[in-house]
Curated annotation (Swiss-Prot):
A Pfam family per the record: Hydrolase_6
Primary role: Catalyzes the dephosphorylation of 2-6 carbon acid sugars in vitro.
NCBIfam families: HAD-SF-IIA, HAD-SF-IIA-hyp2
Similarity-based family: Belongs to the HAD-like hydrolase superfamily. NagD family.
GO-annotated cellular components: cytoplasm
Name listed for the protein in its UniProt record: Acid sugar phosphatase
Keyword annotations from UniProtKB, A to Z: Hydrolase, Magnesium, Metal-binding
Length: 259
């Protein structure tokens, strides 16, 4: 297995499953830290701040710092502020997205006359919120969605994800949004900028082919699939572009790196 200078690492299905740590996750991060190999946690979750993500990882005894976390909310805020500094935004979403947009100097407004409409996962979504978003897009606002995940795993089962909420606005307006999170290259390019490394020097680690592995493939990066989450070994082997590597878990990846 190739020795990479850094790793981009998915969270749910790779580091943990719900509230349970996945075997090998802590060991992999400890291995990287001992070797002095940089890594970033790259997540499509827009509802949490980096501090909240870090807290969850630390509760599982997985070492993490807020500056090592790249959320779809942060990538979205960065994307908009680079295009239109100080722009006005109508948003659906949680505290993670609100904080990211505000800290980027963007102005959050609660009406349809805005520069951008941004859809993030909103667990308190209402018809009125969707109505305002729809009117905003119809009024000419640039339509952004933090991530395309149509379903998310919860204790009760798979529940509607941000892609499902986004699709309501998209179908109503006939306008397709710009997605920011995995598998789009935007969040990956942001992570590479933070690392200061070329894509050839970095590998993407994740469990879900359609988001994690495709995010690496779409940006031309090597990919490491772990069979600890959604996509099975059979799933990824049958794809037109399989991952560079596939391991039972991250313990197996460590064993390969140590050869």
């Amino acid at each position: 297995m190739k020795q990479y200078k850094a790793y981009l690492i998915d969270l749910d299905g790779t580091m943990y499953m719900g509230t349970d740590e996945i075997d090998g996750a802590k060991q992999f991060i400890d291995y990287l830290n001992v070797k002095g190999i940089p890594h970033l946690y790259v997540t499509n979750n827009s509802t949490k701040t980096p501090e909240q993500v870090t807290e969850k990882l630390r509760e599982m005894h997985i070492d993490a710092k807020p500056e090592e976390v790249v959320t779809s909310a942060l990538a979205t805020a960065d994307y908009i502020s680079e295009q239109s500094p100080g722009a006005s935004v109508y948003m659906l979403g949680g505290s993670g997205l609100n904080t990211a947009l505000t800290e980027a100097g963007l102005v959050i407004k609660n009406d349809e006359h805005v520069d951008y409409v941004v859809i993030g996962l909103d667990e308190q979504v209402t018809y009125e919120k969707i109505a305002i978003a729809t009117l905003g897009v119809r009024n000419g606002a640039t339509f952004i969605s933090t991530n395309p995940d149509v379903s998310i795993p919860k204790e009760r089962g798979f529940l509607p994800g941000n892609g499902a909420i986004t699709s309501v606005v998209s179908v109503s307006t006939g306008v397709s949004p710009q997605f920011i999170g995995k598998p789009e290259p935007i969040i990956m390019v942001k992570a590479l900028e933070i690392l200061g490394l070329d894509k050839s020097e970095v590998a993407m680690v994740g469990d879900l082919y359609d988001t994690d592995i495709m995010s690496g493939i779409n940006v031309g990066m090597d990919t490491i699939h772990v069979q600890t989450g959604v996509s099975t070994l059979e799933d990824v082997q049958n794809k037109n572009v399989p991952p560079t590597y596939s391991f039972k878990d991250l313990n197996e990846a460590i064993a390969e790196l140590e050869k």
